[in-house]
Structures are given as C-alpha cells and as structure tokens.
Design a protein with these regions (language model features):
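ABC transporter nucleotide-binding domains
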Residues: 1-265, 272-410
Length: 410
C-alpha cells in the first residue's frame, strides 16, 4: 500500500467496554471503518447506539471506567489504541480535533473566547503573543463571526448558541488537523444555523482536504453531508456503504426503520389546525431588551419593540436565526429576564411587575422545555429527584401519591 492510499483513520474490530463497579459491560462490538482524506463518513444511530463512545475512543477521551478491549485505531497508519494520554495530547488539535456536541459546557465560562481559541496554539508551541492574537482573529473571521475583535474579548455567555459552536470550530481548525470528529455539532441549534455550521465544516474540508467523522442521529444531515454511512445499533454495525446506496436500498431492518422515522427525509410537514378566535393567554407589547457588552461602551439591543399575542389553545412559533432574539424574548415572557421596556401579561398577570413569592408562584403557570439538556439538568441529582422537584415546590402531596405521579410521568 502506498502512503497516498493510507486512510487518515482506520478502525478495525474495535470493541469498547465500561466497568459498572462489578463487571465490564461491552458497549461497542467489533466495529470497523475507514476515512480517506477529504471524505465525510457519518456514524448514524439512535441515542445509546455507541456513536459517541466510538468517536471518543479515537481521540482517547473515554470516561475513566471505559477502555478499548480489542481492535486497532490507526491515524495516518499509526495504531494509537494503546497510547497514553501524554502521547495523545501531541495528536489532539494538531492531527485530530473534536467539535463537541454542547458548546455551553465545552467552553470555559470564566475565560474569554479569544483566550480559549489561543490556548490551542499555546499548547502546541506558539509563544509570540502578537502572532497568537492575530491568528485568533483570523480564525474567528474564518468561521464567520462578525466583529472578531469584539468576539475575542467576550465571554461565552455573551454569545448565542450558534456563535459558541463557531468558536468550537475555530478551536478545532486552529492547527489544520488531518481529521475532525464532529460529535452532533448542530443538534442544539436552529435549522438556519445548523445549515450554516454544516456548510462551514464542508468548506473547511474542501479547503484543507480534512477527513471528517460526523456523529449524528439525524439521517437527513447524514444524507446531505456524508460520502459514506455507518449505521450503528447497540454498539454493532448494522450496515455501511456509500450514502446514496444505503438510503436507496437499505439492507438491514434497523436502517429501514430509521429511514421511516426520519422526518427530514421527505415527510410532508403536518399542517397546523386553524384556531378559533380566543382570548389571548399571552400578550407582549413593545418589548425591548438591552444588554451591556464587555469592552464596549453603550448597550446592545437584543429585542427591539416586539409585540404579539398567543391565543389560548394555539401554538405560536418564534422563528429566526441564532442571535435574533428568540431566546431573550422567551426568557422575558416566563419571567427569567428583566426587559428594558414594554409589557408582558400572561393570563392577565403583568409578568414584568412580579417579585418575590408572586414570581415564584408564577412558575406554576408557565414552564420551559429547555434547548440543551446537558446544561439544564443538574449532574448531582438523579433523574427521579429532578422530576420530583416541581411537585415538592408546588404540590403538597402525600409521599405515596407523589411517587405514583412520578412513575406515571416517567
């Protein structure tokens, strides 16, 4: 085999297990695939299929109780499956980069964006501060962030979800690695930003000849972006091949079911029913919300004079790209934000005037389904405790009745 024909990544008979405190449980079973330079391969499967575990093993980021039981992971022809963390650190960022699934938990909240992008350069030998600063601005510009000088000075909480994901991509491409592992890179983003992020990854792949391992549960994304598919179920490959072939003529029952369940592969959207005129449950009038911006005089206006009504029994969609003010508006409606001007009433209650116990009791009226489960759920609490908390806060129920409610909800 000539050097030119060596795949950037070649995984052979990979098996991975986790120790649960009593015994090892194998979660990935004899998985094999390869990716050539400039190629996109998608690992597809439902939650728990072993996609992320497989991807994490490539870059040596398995949890402490996980290990590669068998098989090989060759990067540019070198088997790294048995490498120490110290050896792998030399590869991370320079040869293989990871775009994590969740930008909120992946970025350090107390360090500026520019400092975090620059860290990748410093870890790999860059010493000149001016060169680092210049390269950071180049990277932020390359990933499509406006005002890169301002963004470099900002902290992650000052950016929208799409902006934060672009920062992670800037970190991943800083040293032009041979392989990028994109682990559900757009799952928490709106459709408009999702396409832009995927377009950006595709542009970078073409520019640098980078190989891309795309981890996704979305067959629509895989169909649109990947040269080849590997379909996983319970840690086992169900089938793999060129994307068009797998989608046109799936061989496994599981793949056929995934295709049938994929709304992004041609299913006609449901038509919303017409609503009979009803009293509004929510009324927003002239909503304005300004934010202070670090390192900049004046205020940034995120929401500017929005007004709308939501009738009882209806569904009202707020649509816009990342940074358009959707989330700020919703947080104001539920009483989490403090608007600069305007009036919000929910079931006749002026939300902007609520304080203390009145605001706490208002939480029973309006609840959020959050965008990002990783940063919304307390890792120190069990799932049972998290779901039980609203009942403890707002319902005085006997323990037996509360437990029955809990089991019904679960």
């Amino acid at each position: 085999m000539t050097e030119a024909a060596i795949p950037v990544l070649q995984v052979e008979n990979l098996s991975i297990a986790y120790h649960d405190g009593q015994a090892e449980q194998r979660t990935v079973h004899e998985v094999s695939f390869s990716i050539a330079a400039g190629e996109v391969l998608a690992l597809v499967g439902e939650s728990g299929s072993g996609k992320t575990t497989t991807a994490q093993s490539i870059i040596g980021l398995l949890a402490d109780n996980g290990r590669v039981q068998a098989g090989s992971i060759r990067i540019n022809g070198t088997d790294v499956a048995g490498w120490s963390q110290r050896q792998l650190e030399a590869l991370r960022g320079k040869v293989v980069s990871l775009i994590p699934q969740d930008p909120t938990t992946s970025l350090n909240p107390v360090r500026t964006v520019g400092d975090q992008v620059g860290e990748m350069l410093r870890l790999h030998g860059w010493r000149d501060k001016k060169q680092i600063a210049q390269r950071v601005l180049e990277l932020l510009h390359k990933v499509g962030l406006s005002q890169p000088e301002l963004r470099a000075r900002q902290f992650p909480h000052e950016l929208s979800g799409g902006m934060k994901q672009r920062v992670l991509i800037a970190i991943a491409i800083a040293l032009q690695p041979a392989l990028i592992i994109a682990d559900e890179p757009t799952s928490a983003l709106d459709v408009t930003v999702q396409r832009r992020i995927l377009d950006l990854i595709d542009d970078l792949r073409r520019e640098f000849g980078t190989a891309v391992l795309l981890v996704t549960h979305d067959l629509g994304v895989a169909a649109d972006r990947a040269n080849r598919l590997v379909v996983l179920q319970a840690g086992r490959i169900q089938e793999q091949g060129p994307t068009a072939d797998v989608l046109r003529n799936p061989q496994s029952r599981y793949t056929r079911q995934l295709l049938a369940d994929a709304p992004s592969l041609g299913t006609a959207p449901a038509r919303a029913p017409r609503t009979v005129a009803a009293e509004p449950a929510i009324v927003v009038q002239g909503l304005v919300h300004d934010f202070a911006v670090a390192g900049q005089r004046g205020l940034f206006r995120a929401v500017d004079g929005i007004s709308f009504e939501v009738p009882r029994g209806s569904t009202h969609a707020i649509v816009g790209e990342s940074g358009s003010g959707k989330t700020t508006t919703i947080r104001d409606v539920v009483g989490f934000g403090k608007p600069t001007a305007g009036r919000i009433t929910v079931e006749g209650v002026d939300v902007t005037s609520l304080r203390g116990e009145a605001l706490r009791q208002f939480r029973k009226t309006v609840q959020l389904v959050y965008q990002n489960p990783f940063s919304s759920l307390d890792p120190r609490q069990s799932i049972y405790a998290i779901i039980e908390e609203p009942l403890l806060n707002f319902e005085r129920l006997p323990p037996a009745e509360r437990e029955r409610r809990m089991h019904d909800m679960l």
